[in-house]
């Protein structure tokens, strides 16, 4: 009984992760500038991958009865490196003066880099 519930939760997490990853891929294709694309890739792709790995983790607990440490390390690795790498890529694009779209109206980093020669 409890095994079926855990497997059902695992399937729900895997399906949600796949849907979030698919929406992320569509967003990366459709968004106009690197800053919007980086936001989509850094936030929602990380969430989709974590849901997929967590669903797999639950499945292994339910079927085999053991905790897979590789999946836990994978979840932690993606949780740390996904948003961090996206942030660094967007910061590098800003330093290279990559243009915004014309819809972007706010530049919050303008004053931070005003005096620095980067």
From Swiss-Prot:
Chief location of this protein within or outside the cell: membrane
Localization terms from the record: Cell membrane
GO cellular component: plasma membrane
Superkingdom assignment: Bacteria
Leader sequence residues: none
GO molecular function annotation: sodium:proton antiporter activity
Protein topology in the membrane: Multi-pass membrane protein
Keywords: Antiport, Cell membrane, Hydrogen ion transport, Ion transport, Membrane, Sodium, Sodium transport, Transmembrane, Transmembrane helix, Transport
Transmembrane parts of this sequence: 9-29, 47-67, 69-89
UniProt subunit comment: May form a heterooligomeric complex that consists of seven subunits: mnhA1, mnhB1, mnhC1, mnhD1, mnhE1, mnhF1 and mnhG1.
Family of the protein in this entry: Belongs to the CPA3 antiporters (TC 2.A.63) subunit G family.
Protein's job: Mnh complex is a Na(+)/H(+) antiporter involved in Na(+) excretion.
Full protein name: Na(+)/H(+) antiporter subunit G1
Species in which this protein is naturally found: Staphylococcus haemolyticus (strain JCSC1435)
GN (gene name): mnhG1
